[in-house]
Amino acid sequence: VPQMVYYVYAYTRLVADGTIKAGDKINVDVPTGNFGNILAAYYAKEMGLPIAKFICASNDNKVLFDFFQTGTYDRNREFILTTSPSMDILISSNLERLIYKIAGNDAEKNSELMKELTTDGVYTITDDMKAKLAEFYGGYATEAETAATIKKVYESDDYIIDTHTAVAATVYGKYVAETGDKTPTVIASTASPYKFTRSVMNAIDPEYDSKTDFELVDELEKLSGVKVPQAIEDILSLIHISEPTRRVVI
């Protein structure tokens, strides 16, 4: 429920900024593995928010992309560790709620499909159900594409995004190239670059890889102009040098 507020707030900001007029439709682009954040946007639309398209952005664990392409959800695949770990998921538990909706609120059908996922690792929705997914677009970004987008956004806009946001930005570019749809779009930035400092800084310049994690925090602050979050400052304050061994203790 709290995530629904993100999209209502973003819409009101677009109206206030003059980007759109009240009642105009927008698209939303969400990096997701568990399907929770984008489901919140879907529920916001059900409550009246004018959303035209839901762009579901996946990383290399592209089980959701394949589902929207084919109508088959198949978790029987290699699990890939990526630089956007919050999306490293093969069982998108919140997708069940959307399945229930497109099944016509048929709890029995929904239960049948979820049982197939548990026992066989795969299920396929009906053609009628798949037709109800027309407002969704599935896309994915590779690790190389994600890193390239971080670098591109920094160099073109002097703005630093995290790996998950970069997945969404990459997929948005693919969506526009494929469809030509220029509807104003909200890209959900779901994490701080400070949470994935090494991946972000290495994408900007591989030479940063020689620095320690805490040195990278300082470098990120210099590049971004954004103050180090208090939670990280608190961790830094716990570091001390143990005298006689000179070990760093956290």
Residues of each region from the PLM?
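Solvent-exposed, flexible loop/coil residues
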Residues: 39, 68-72, 127-129, 144-145, ...
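Exposed alpha-helical structural elements
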Residues: 63, 97, 108-113, 145, ...
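Single conserved hydrophobic/aromatic residue that forms the stacking wall/gate
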Residues: 239-250
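Short beta-alpha connecting loops at secondary-structure transitions
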Residues: 77-86, 131-135, 237-238
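Conserved active-site and cofactor/substrate-binding residues in soluble primary-metabolism enzymes
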Residues: 2-6, 35-39, 89-97, 141-148, ...
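Active-site-adjacent helical/loop segments in soluble small-molecule enzymes
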Residues: 1-17, 22-25, 101-182
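Glycine-rich phosphate/pyrophosphate-binding loop at beta-loop-alpha junctions
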Residues: 19-22, 27-117, 188-204
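Catalytic phosphate/nucleotide-handling subdomain of diverse soluble enzymes
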Residues: 49-65, 170-234
